[in-house]
Regions:
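Processing junctions and N-termini across compartments
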Residues: 11-12, 63
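Compact alpha-helical subdomains of small soluble proteins
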Residues: 29-75
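Hydrophobic alpha-helical targeting segments used for export or membrane insertion
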Residues: 1-11
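Mature extracytoplasmic domains of secretory-pathway proteins
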Residues: 21-29
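Intrinsically disordered, low-complexity Ser/Thr/Pro-rich tracts
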Residues: 2, 18, 35-39
C-alpha cells in the first residue's frame, strides 16, 4: 500500500471541497464532507495520522483550495 502524504490528501480534499462548494454548500459543510470522503477512500486512521504529523497544515490546505477554486476562497 502506498503511504498517504499530506499533498495527496490535500489534493483529494481540495477537489472534493470545490465540488461541494459548486453544489452550494458553505465552506464548513464542504470541508467536513470532503474529509469524510477522504476517510472513506484512505481510511480514517491514515487521514488522522497525516493531519497529526503535518506542519503548516492550514497554510497548505488554504493554498491548495485557493488554487483549485479561488472563486470560493478569495473574496
Amino acid at each position: 500500500m502506498i503511504e498517504l502524504t499530506l499533498i495527496t490528501l490535500l489534493n483529494y480534499v481540495g477537489d472534493n471541497f470545490c465540488e461541494y462548494r459548486n453544489l452550494g454548500h458553505d465552506n464548513y459543510k464542504s470541508l467536513l464532507l470532503s474529509y469524510s470522503d477522504a476517510s472513506n477512500k484512505f481510511g480514517p486512521l491514515e487521514v488522522k495520522k497525516v493531519i497529526e504529523k503535518s506542519k503548516n497544515f492550514k497554510v497548505a490546505a488554504v493554498a491548495i483550495a485557493a488554487t483549485k477554486c479561488p472563486q470560493h476562497i478569495v473574496k
